């Protein structure tokens, strides 16, 4: 080591003497040009080149000077000539000793040049003319001749050396099968392989062994390994080293070096090669060669021996443990992993690791634990396979239990919703009571304050009166005044003048009474009110819509006026609205009926629609069947004031040739022509003698309804009178309500009855309507019956709707996870808009629908997809926020306005029922209905109030207006948002699976493209695919390790990363995908 130290000092002095003076900095333009040339020559990755471009001009100039100094140091052939000189066997030992003094220094300069010079210098060193790699490997072999041959006798060494080319030849064949190097390089390798094999088949001479022992005492082996590492750091150099027949073998044989630092360097380099595609097989082949050369009984025997014996060097032990972990567990074939694992188990690795489990070195402990985590437990795998079926059956049972529990959970949620509603009602009631108590307290506090103020004023008045009385007594004693009492209790204070006589002016002080004048004025009676004015004329005065009253004399004020005489009977009603608005004197004659229309000889039936008299048109009978004209007809009550009220279509028909019209438009399928004259003569003979007062269609529909009931008119009317819903179902009552007699129908029926015409002549429908219309308060009773019959169904229908509104409102307002989601959306929205529109403090809920409209640059995902990813990765605890939103979908389908109107209708129906019961308190059916259902209606009203308040609160809570945002608008926003969010989650998962499948496919294609020439046209697409693979890996692997593609600097990166992050295999310790999720790791490949 002292020699090494002297070499280092010589190296420092040598560099100090050769450092040129600092040249002046050129112009900025020239500086940038020279810096660009140097940067291109350095062949750096883009990120490092970008970092160097950020240097200031001073640092750039220093870098230019350093690079130019290194570049002009020595050309490659200089180092090659010096190394060949050390290998010359004809050199005398004295001359060799003098030359070898500077060998380490030459190798160090070579390593620096290989590591720092541009790629052109390295390619020149490795080209066909210089063959720098062959020379370097040959020198490495020479440097460790002595170490290798000192392990065995000369005889065994000869046998090993003769067979040494066999594993090399096998390795060469394997390498050439998968080599993708260009043909010139392949020819170079084959030639160098023949040259090296020729040398290895000859026994080293005695002088060579002595020279090798002299070199082995120095650091030449260590620096040679560093030179090879620098070469392998370039992709071009790495491929050449991997294709060289002896390079990796010589690196592995360097483990025989006595320097632990060198052995650690070798193991780190071999471990990095294992992680490159195809490198693992080369490393195993090198250790097979190591076994034959060193006479091992088992592979890796010397490695384990060094691992046990070098326990005082932690760095070497860490490197050994790291290499063992990688060489065993970096292969994909699980059976091969178990085989390699068992190799080290037979060498005693497991027992030795058990001894090292209490080591004080954290680095070593980390590597040991990484190996133990990657170990395959075959027994555990067998147990997993045996228990898998039982576990699957258990899973099925658990899924069935989950299904049952989900049903129970749904029932529990329904019960919870009812309890929540009850609690909300109680809370609202308590809040109301609290408000009342506060008002009472406020009023009481005001009254107490007022009373205290009055007491204080009274006390002050008493005190003032006492003071005045004292002053009066004092003045009386002094003789200034004289107090004179009067008979009515008043006190007169008379001042005394100097002459001793009383003053004429006296002051009267009122005690408990007022003065005489004021008392008289206040105690006198009020004047009587003026009598009412007499009527202006003696003629009787008529009152609109009221009876005629004669004038009465004005009564005196004290007695009440006598009642007016009874009015005369009212006149008969007039048809039309004039009877309601125009007053008429008694005994006024009725108006004459309207004359018949032109062209008609018989009078027409006229009915009053409330607006104007409308003539009922008779149906027209045609000879042939005519097609139907599908128009939209106006109802009779809709033509008043229209143009149709002023035209007469029947007069037009008289002017037209209807026979021709029928002939033209008659339908194709016709029967014999109808003789209208004969039919008119037969109608009176076939028709019944019954008289019909109702409109034909109405009477027909009424007859159908009555036939469905199967009850007589008496039974129906009696059931209506006593509200018997058992006799009359509610459906029949609702149908019958459509046939409540109109005012005109009642008038026609009453007129028929007053004329005392026989009822037998009426049809069944008219007789029913006659009896039906005589029921007192028919409209009210029918409404009450319909209300009572539908009450239970209405309560059952409205209650769940109100509960859904309450539960949805409370769950949305109280959801902390939803609040977090909105917070994320607000943050991202402000981030996107702040530079253009400025930051906002909130947003309308309708903005949630716009999350799907905001798409990424590549148009492959929306803002909602991104939010879903962010929530899953950063805020996983709120990813199931929609589970906190209960009954939102049910609430979205509720029209709260209509529900509240229905509740009010129920209240009106209950009020109508109560009024009817007060008039007929003997009706037990009404009494029982009111007693049993009044509380239910009150509860429903409370629920409606709570639902309205809860909905208003949640709408205001989210910044919306309850008046313009009904539940049908508010809740669907959350329904759509939750649906879109779930869909975004599913699409994100699908996209990840597709990306994973694509990555696997590209990995398969990558193996095939390794055979392609880098200069071919497909090389560019290959690089793009490799970049895509790297990106996909970065998405999958969540740790800080990098992905290595075919680029310069990869070996250094792998070694650096392995020092910080231990290697983790693809499958964990148990190795069962059923019980443990596979742990993804990286593949390092070129």
UniProtKB/Swiss-Prot annotation:
Compositionally biased tracts (Pro residues): 525-537, 548-576, 583-597
Residue ranges of every copy of the DAD domain listed in the record: 1040-1079
InterPro entries xref list: ARM-like (IPR011989), ARM-type_fold (IPR016024), DAD_dom (IPR014767), FH2_Formin (IPR015425), FH2_Formin_sf (IPR042201), FH3_dom (IPR010472), FMNL_animal (IPR043592), GBD/FH3_dom (IPR014768)
Family note: Belongs to the formin homology family.
Signal sequence annotation: none
UniProt record, GO biological process: cell migration; cortical actin cytoskeleton organization; cytoskeleton organization; regulation of cell morphogenesis; regulation of cell shape
Feature: compositional bias, Polar residues: 538-547
Entry keyword Metal-binding: no
Keyword Zinc: no
Sites of Phosphoserine modification: 188
Pfam families (alphabetical): Drf_FH3, Drf_GBD, FH2
GO cellular component, one term: cytosol
Lipid-modified residues, N-myristoyl glycine kind: 2
Domain characteristics, as noted in the entry: The DAD domain regulates activation via by an autoinhibitory interaction with the GBD/FH3 domain. This autoinhibition is released upon competitive binding of an activated GTPase. The release of DAD allows the FH2 domain to then nucleate and elongate nonbranched actin filaments.
Gene3D superfamilies associated with the record: Formin, FH2 domain, Leucine-rich Repeat Variant
Name this polypeptide is given: Formin-like protein 2
Keywords attached to this entry: Cytoplasm, Lipoprotein, Myristate, Phosphoprotein
Cross-referenced PANTHER family: FORMIN-LIKE PROTEIN, FORMIN-LIKE PROTEIN 2
Domain named FH2: residues: 616-1007
Region span, Disordered: 513-597
């Amino acid at each position: 080591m002292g020699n090494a130290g002297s070499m280092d000092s010589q190296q420092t002095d040598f560099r100090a003497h050769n450092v040129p003076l600092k040249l002046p900095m050129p112009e900025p333009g020239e500086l940038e040009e020279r810096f660009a040339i140097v940067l291109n020559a350095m062949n750096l990755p883009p990120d490092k080149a970008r970092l160097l471009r950020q240097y200031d001009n001073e640092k750039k100039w220093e870098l230019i000077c350093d690079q130019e100094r290194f570049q002009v140091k020595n050309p490659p052939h200089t180092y090659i000539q010096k190394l060949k000189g050390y290998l010359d066997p004809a050199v005398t030992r004295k001359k060799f000793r003098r030359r070898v003094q500077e060998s380490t220094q030459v190798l160090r300069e070579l390593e620096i040049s290989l590591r720092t010079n541009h790629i052109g210098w390295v390619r020149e060193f490795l080209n066909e003319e210089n063959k720098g790699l062959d020379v370097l490997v040959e020198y490495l072999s020479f440097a460790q001749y002595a170490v290798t041959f000192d392990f065995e006798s000369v005889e065994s060494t000869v046998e090993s050396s003769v067979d040494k080319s066999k594993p090399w030849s096998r390795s060469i064949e394997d390498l050439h099968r998968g080599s993708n190097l260009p043909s010139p390089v392949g020819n170079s390798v084959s030639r160098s392989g023949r040259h090296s094999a020729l040398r290895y088949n000859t026994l080293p001479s005695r002088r060579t062994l002595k020279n090798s022992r002299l070199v082995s005492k120095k650091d030449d082996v260590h620096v040679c390994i560093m030179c090879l590492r620098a070469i392998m750091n370039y992709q071009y150099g790495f491929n050449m080293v991997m294709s060289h027949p002896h390079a990796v073998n010589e690196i592995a044989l360097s483990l025989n070096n006595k320097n632990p630092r060198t052995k650690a360097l070798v193991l780190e380099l071999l471990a990095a090669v294992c992680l490159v595609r195809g490198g693992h097989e080369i490393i195993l082949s090198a250790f097979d060669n190591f076994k034959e050369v060193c006479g091992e009984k088992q592979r890796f025997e010397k490695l384990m021996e060094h691992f046990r014996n070098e326990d005082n060097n932690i760095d070497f032990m860490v490197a050994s443990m790291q290499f063992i972990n990688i060489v065993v567990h970096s292969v994909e074939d699980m059976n091969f992993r178990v085989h390699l694992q068992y190799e080290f188990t037979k060498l005693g690795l497991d027992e030795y690791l058990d001894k090292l489990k209490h080591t004080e070195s954290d680095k070593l402990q980390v590597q040991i634990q990484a190996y133990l985590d990657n170990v395959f437990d075959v027994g555990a795998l067998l147990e997993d396979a045996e228990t898998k079926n039982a576990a699957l059956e258990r899973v099925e049972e658990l899924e069935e239990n989950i299904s049952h529990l989900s049903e129970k959970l749904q029932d529990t949620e329904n019960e919870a919703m009812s309890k929540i509603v009850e609690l909300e009602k109680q809370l609202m009631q308590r809040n109301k009571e609290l408000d009342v108590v506060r008002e009472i307290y406020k009023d009481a506090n005001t009254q107490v304050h007022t009373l205290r103020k009055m007491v204080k004023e009274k006390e002050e008045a008493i005190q003032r009166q006492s003071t005045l009385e004292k002053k009066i007594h004092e003045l009386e004693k002094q003789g200034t005044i004289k107090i004179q009492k009067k008979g009515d209790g008043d006190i007169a204070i008379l001042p005394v003048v100097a002459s001793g006589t009383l003053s004429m002016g006296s002051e009267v002080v009122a005690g408990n009474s007022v003065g005489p004048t004021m008392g008289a004025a206040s105690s006198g009676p009020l004047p009587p009110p003026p009598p009412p004015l007499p009527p202006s004329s003696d003629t009787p005065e008529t009152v609109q819509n009221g009876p005629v009253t004669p004038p009465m004399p004005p009564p005196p004020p004290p007695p009440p006026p006598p009642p007016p005489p009874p009015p005369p009977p009212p006149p008969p009603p007039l048809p039309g609205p004039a009877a309601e608005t125009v007053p008429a004197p008694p005994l006024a004659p009725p108006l004459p009926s309207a004359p018949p229309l032109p062209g008609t000889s018989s009078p027409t039936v006229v009915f009053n629609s409330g607006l104007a008299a409308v003539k009922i048109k008779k149906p027209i009978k045609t000879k042939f069947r005519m097609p139907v004209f599908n128009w939209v007809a106006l109802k009779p009550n809709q033509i008043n004031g229209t143009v149709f009220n002023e035209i007469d279509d029947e007069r037009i028909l008289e002017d037209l040739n209807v026979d021709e019209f029928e002939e033209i438009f008659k339908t194709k399928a016709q029967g014999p022509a109808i003789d209208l004259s004969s039919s008119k003569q037969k109608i009176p003979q076939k028709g019944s003698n019954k008289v019909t007062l109702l409109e034909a269609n109405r009477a027909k529909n009424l007859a159908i309804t009555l036939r469905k009931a199967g009850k007589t008119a008496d039974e129906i009317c009696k059931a209506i009178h006593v509200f018997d819903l058992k006799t009359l179902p509610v459906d029949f009552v609702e149908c019958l309500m459509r046939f409540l007699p109109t005012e005109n129908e009642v008038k026609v029926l009453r007129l028929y009855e007053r004329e005392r015409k026989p009822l037998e002549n009426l049809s069944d429908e008219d007789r029913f309507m006659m009896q039906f219309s005589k029921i007192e308060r028919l409209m009210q009773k029918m409404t009450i019956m319909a209300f009572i019959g539908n009450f239970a169904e209405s309560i059952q229908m409205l209650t769940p709707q109100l509960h859904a509104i309450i539960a949805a409102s409370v769950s949305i307002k109280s959801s902390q996870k939803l609040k977090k989601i909105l917070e994320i959306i607000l943050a991202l929205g402000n981030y996107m808009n702040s530079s253009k529109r400025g930051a906002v403090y909130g947003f309308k809920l309708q903005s949630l629908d716009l999350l799907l409209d905001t798409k990424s640059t590549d148009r492959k995902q929306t803002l909602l997809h991104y939010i879903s990813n962010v929530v899953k990765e950063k805020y996983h605890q709120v990813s199931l926020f929609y589970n906190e939103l209960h009954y939102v979908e049910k609430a979205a389908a509720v029209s709260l306005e209509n529900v509240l109107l229905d509740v009010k209708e129920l209240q009106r129906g209950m009020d109508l029922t109560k009024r009817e019961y007060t008039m007929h308190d003997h009706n037990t059916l009404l009494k029982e209905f009111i007693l049993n259902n009044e509380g239910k209606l009150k509860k429903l009203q409370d629920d409606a109030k709570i639902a309205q308040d809860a909905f208003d609160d949640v709408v205001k809570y989210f910044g919306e207006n309850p008046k313009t945002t009904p539940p049908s608008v508010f809740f669907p926003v959350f329904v759509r948002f939750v649906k879109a969010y779930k869909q975004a989650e599913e699409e994100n998962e699908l996209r990840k699976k597709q990306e994973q499948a694509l990555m696997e496919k590209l990995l398969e294609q990558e193996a095939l493209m390794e055979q392609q020439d880098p200069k071919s046209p497909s090389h560019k697409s290959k690089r793009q695919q490799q970049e895509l693979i790297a990106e996909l890996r970065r998405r999958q692997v969540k740790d800080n390790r990098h992905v290595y593609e075919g680029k310069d600097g990869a070996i250094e990166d792998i070694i650096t990363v392995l020092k910080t992050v231990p290697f983790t295999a693809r499958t964990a310790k148990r190795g069962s995908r059923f019980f443990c999720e596979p742990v993804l790791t990286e593949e390092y490949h070129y």
